[in-house]
Amino acid sequence: MTGKITTLLFDLDGTLINTNELIIKTFQATLQEFLPDRVFTREDILPFIGPSLMETFREINPAHAEEMRVFYREYNLKHHDDLILEYEGVYEAIRVLYEEDYKLGIVSTKMYDTIMRGLKVTGLDKFFQVVIGLDQVSNAKPDPEGIEMALSLLNATKEEAIMIGDNYHDIEAGKNAETLTAGVAWAIKGPEHLAQFQPDFMLEKMSDLLAIVRDEE
């Protein structure tokens, strides 16, 4: 793939905003509520980060998956603003990309309203022209539907786009949509885990994107 990158699509959790503690505590509360006889460590919960909630809960407890999803969302929203954190340098890098007229979008496995809440808490909401949540697509990442929808709304092509994320779902979705891909080294599962899915780039910090998009011009 050659040519100018004009469009950058991002995952939200673990990429733009640090919701790791929020997610882990929410999973712990949900699992304690529905599976009190089982013990889940933080390490046990890490694989749950990335897939959609229903995908995870159907594997754990298919008979109560929907109830678990509802409980999770209620707990998550209640504690959201207290546990969400910013990643150093993300706001500034996104601001520069926005000011340089790059097209910016989000493709997440979270619901649209929860995405917007996280963006507003961190002040990032003003930079993104398109936000695609789980409730706007029929197929979650790694299916390319969300990326393709975002590109269409941004009037952009796959040849000029890059998908950035912290999980294999993000990298695989980008590959399935035939965009460039970038992993983030601050992923909770670690850069080594993400590297095995062979993203085109690995970001040590969000500002690394500036060099990548400028080099592609």
UniProtKB/Swiss-Prot annotation:
Q: Which residues cross the membrane?
A: none
UniProt-listed Gene3D superfamilies: HAD superfamily/HAD-like, Putative phosphatase, domain 2
Q: Name one GO molecular function term.
A: phosphoglycolate phosphatase activity
Q: Is Kinase tagged as a keyword?
A: no
Enzyme Commission code(s) on record: 3.6.1.1
UniProtKB keywords: Hydrolase, Magnesium
Q: Which residues form the active site?
A: 11 (nucleophile)
Give the reaction(s) catalysed: diphosphate + H2O = 2 phosphate + H(+)
Q: Which InterPro entries match?
A: HAD-like_hydrolase_sf, HAD-like_sf, HAD-SF_hydro_IA, HAD_2, HAD_sf, PGP-like_dom2, Pyrophosphatase_Ppax
Q: Which cofactor does it need?
A: Mg(2+)
Instruction: Give the GO terms filed under biological process for this record.
Output: DNA repair
Q: Which GO terms describe its cellular component?
A: cytosol
The family this protein is said to belong to: Belongs to the HAD-like hydrolase superfamily. PpaX family.
State what this protein does.
Hydrolyzes pyrophosphate formed during P-Ser-HPr dephosphorylation by HPrK/P. Might play a role in controlling the intracellular pyrophosphate pool.
Q: What is this protein called?
A: Pyrophosphatase PpaX
